[in-house]
């Protein structure tokens, strides 16, 4: 695992504890994680994959199973979460980086064919807009972004509680994603009979003038 320095933050302190119970508890409310991978596999067969907010590595394991030949990079701010991820993914084609995602990962080269955010962007407060911009810069022309995340809730008390847990639930992600990428999938789903909604988005980066999509 490679590491770069990351500043201390409330989010890091939050996951210092939650890393120990994350895999045992998140199945009950982080819906759509397998579906977004399944839907992404319909539109791309990526050679280079980036997951932002890879956490304990659950999606990294699924990505490796679906795309066995791909080079995979996982980025997260939490050292305890990355330590768990490192125990799950031990192949030479997977790299883990500890860093904030406020700027692109790659400095030069081909870029990534797929960037995945799984219940990450709604916790980047502030920073979600910069993360979307960084993902756009990290993607190769014609590359795809896949996002599954909380959307919104009509219940103010629930929104406030999620805010205590660093989650912003205002439906703010989807318009920006649809503006920045060509939408291939853009859906909202109810959870627990409408207590909240979550969203699934897959979009494609358009080639700039003079660039070609292979």
Model features per residue range: what roles?
Residues 142-150:
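Conserved beta-strand signature within the Rossmann-like core of class I S-adenosyl-L-methionine
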Residues 129-141:
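A short glycine-rich, Lys/Arg-flanked "PGG" loop and its adjoining helix->strand segment in the class I
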Residues 50-52, 56-103:
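Class I SAM-dependent methyltransferase SAM/SAH-binding core
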Residues 166-181:
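Short alpha-helix
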Residues 182, 188-214:
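Core SAM-dependent methyltransferase catalytic element
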Residues 1-43, 58, 62, 159-163:
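Conserved class I S-adenosyl-L-methionine
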Residues 114-127:
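A short SAM/SAH-binding and catalytic strip from SAM-dependent methyltransferases
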Residues 105-115:
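A short acidic, Gly/Pro-enriched loop at the edge of an enzyme's catalytic core
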């Amino acid at each position: 695992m490679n590491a770069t320095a990351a500043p201390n933050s409330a989010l890091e302190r939050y996951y210092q504890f939650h890393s120990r119970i994350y895999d045992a508890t998140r199945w009950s409310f982080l819906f759509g994680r397998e579906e977004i991978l399944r839907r992404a596999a319909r539109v791309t067969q990526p050679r280079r994959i980036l997951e932002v907010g890879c956490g304990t590595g659950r999606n990294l394991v699924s990505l490796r199973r679906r795309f066995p030949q791909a080079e995979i990079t996982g980025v997260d701010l939490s050292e305890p979460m990355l330590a768990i991820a490192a125990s799950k993914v031990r192949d030479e084609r997977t790299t883990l980086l500890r860093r904030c995602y406020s700027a692109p990962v790659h400095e030069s080269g081909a870029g990534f064919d797929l960037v995945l955010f799984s219940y990450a962007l709604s916790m980047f407060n502030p920073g979600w807009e910069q993360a979307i911009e960084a993902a756009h810069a990290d993607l190769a022309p014609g590359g795809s972004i896949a996002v599954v995340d909380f959307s919104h809730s009509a219940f103010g008390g629930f929104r406030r509680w999620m805010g205590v847990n660093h989650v912003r639930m205002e439906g703010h992600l989807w318009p920006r994603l649809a503006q920045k990428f060509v939408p291939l999938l853009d859906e909202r789903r109810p959870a627990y009979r409408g207590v909240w909604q979550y969203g699934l988005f897959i979009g494609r980066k358009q080639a700039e003038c003079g660039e070609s999509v292979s």
